[in-house]
Amino acid sequence: ELYGLTRADIDFERHCIHVRRQLCRTAEKPYFVTPPKTKSGIRNVPMTDTVCAALRRVVKARASTKVEALVDGCSGFLFLDKSGMPKVAMHLENYMRGVQGKFEKAYGKPVPRITPHVLRHTFCTNVQQAGLDVKSLQYLMGHSNASVTLDVYTHSSFESVERAFEQIAGNL
């Protein structure tokens, strides 16, 4: 979803991101736009001040191109590669793999593989543990069913259960 964003999808006044599409690429088809996997994936996501500031920097730093890439009627993608073409998820995965390799080389220790999808799980878990209600979290994640949000994307540990239990223990 990140790389499918265009300037028109960012509403800085309302601190809101309009998620409408995914930008994809395969060996057979260089670039194409698809809607999110489910109808619930089309949504407006509130931005934190940190995200808003980061996207302002992206918009400001985005180089203007001589010719804007047009993919299935969409243009103005926020994230471009060195040749001015829109980035896709593979670009971020490769970048993250490179950072992981540099870390392992510098410190001589393997680290768990971190992907954009792992970060999505981490975000979902952290927001749930911070206390956001399930329906709001389901909406944020773009899931059509809360069971996907809870059963697949949120994860518990003994420490998180212990912290939550300590918060309610006085009410028992």
What are these language model-derived features?
Residues 14-19, 115, 126, 138-156, ...:
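Short functional hotspots where side chains directly engage DNA or cofactors
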Residues 4-63, 70-74:
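Conserved tyrosine-mediated DNA breakage-rejoining catalytic core shared by Y-recombinases
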Residues 20, 48, 80-82, 154:
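Residue-level detector of conserved, well-ordered beta-strand and adjacent loop positions
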Residues 28-33, 130, 151, 155-172:
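DNA/chromatin major-groove-contacting recognition/catalytic segments
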Residues 1-4, 136:
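Acidic donor-binding helix in nucleotide-sugar-dependent glycosyltransferases
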Residues 45, 61-86, 90-139, 143-146:
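Short, basic (Lys/Arg/His-rich) helix/loop patches that form interaction surfaces
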Residues 49, 53, 57-60, 94, ...:
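Generic recognition of well-ordered alpha-helical segments
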Residues 5-8, 122, 151, 156:
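Structural detector for helix-capping/boundary residues
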